[in-house]
Swiss-Prot record:
InterPro entries: ATP_PFK, ATP_PFK_prok-type, PFKA_ATP_prok, Phosphofructokinase_CS, Phosphofructokinase_dom, PKF_sf. ADP binds at R21, A22, V23, V24, R25, R154, G185, A186, D187, K213, K214, H215. Belongs to the phosphofructokinase type A (PFKA) family. ATP-dependent PFK group I subfamily. Prokaryotic clade 'B1' sub-subfamily. This is ATP-dependent 6-phosphofructokinase. Its cofactor is Mg(2+). Allosterically activated by ADP and other diphosphonucleosides, and allosterically inhibited by phosphoenolpyruvate. It comes from the Bacteria. PANTHER family: ATP-DEPENDENT 6-PHOSPHOFRUCTOKINASE, PHOSPHOFRUCTOKINASE. ATP binds at G11, R72, Y73, G102, D103, G104, S105. It comes from Streptococcus pneumoniae (strain CGSP14). Its main location: cytoplasm. Substrate binds at T125, I126, D127, R162, M169, G170, R171, E222, R244, H250, I251, Q252, R253. One of its GO terms (biological process) is fructose 6-phosphate metabolic process.
Amino acid sequence: MKRIAVLTSGGDAPGMNAAIRAVVRQAISEGMEVFGIYDGYAGMVAGEIHPLDAASVGDIISRGGTFLHSARYPEFAQLEGQLKGIEQLKKHGIEGVVVIGGDGSYHGAMRLTEHGFPAIGLPGTIDNDIVGTDFTIGFDTAVTTAMDAIDKIRDTSSSHRRTFVIEVMGRNAGDIALWAGIATGADEIIIPEAGFKMEDIVASIKAGYECGKKHNIIVLAEGVMSAAEFGQKLKEAGDTSDLRVTELGHIQRGGSPTARDRVLASRMGTHAVKLLKEGIGGVAVGIRNEKMVENPILGTAEEGALFSLTAEGKIVVNNPHKADIELSSLNKSLS
């Protein structure tokens, strides 16, 4: 394989630039030409395919977002869209593609491989909801951003003896809420994978203030409901505390990636090029126990929920490549 391309698709994630940089520099070291596909699959169909060199990716390892830009392009799920994209790949002599994104991006990579263009998927999403990898590119940065914001909110919450419901991102997965909640000593962590009773939370808030607590921090995954709706339900269930709600929003998708995300992205990008060099396609790169691994894209893109909660309070990880997480009481005070 002499000529490959790289694209980013779907929602952006800190560390994508580091992954692109690794792909480009490893490809050059392997004697390959590398092209950047701008604007994801939409750019592929439109022919926005341009050569990249070492200088193209200089000084981007510390930058958030993706300099190749990203876009959602549902039309690529249809055969017509796929054939248009393949026509452009052939026109530019592309023999393999590295796709950085989430599960929707993986479906596109799977289609490319089926049409004879080996594609490698790299898990680029802050949600950490990709099967077959312990961590995704961008997750660590998103958790760190959420942690920093929650720490600041705790300060003002304590000053005014307030209850805060803080909504974090994650789509249908509760990973960001779980990690950020534990890291900040949140009083409650509400995630889609675990049930909760509103009256129990109200009782916990009341008991906390009665014993002298100066604040109450509830970290809520967006996949459960919005912070505004959750706050309203708290009041309907009898909460009388001074309540505020905050949605952290897209701040979690931006910013300079952490060292962990930069290194993870660099390792994954390098590994992807080595696989393409060997003519391997149709796989997604992951990390398990700090080692690079590959999983079939088909299974990776089509698995269901990553973990669920048993009646005993144990989180069972449906993804066999993630370690079980033991929490004695997920929705009790962790502070």
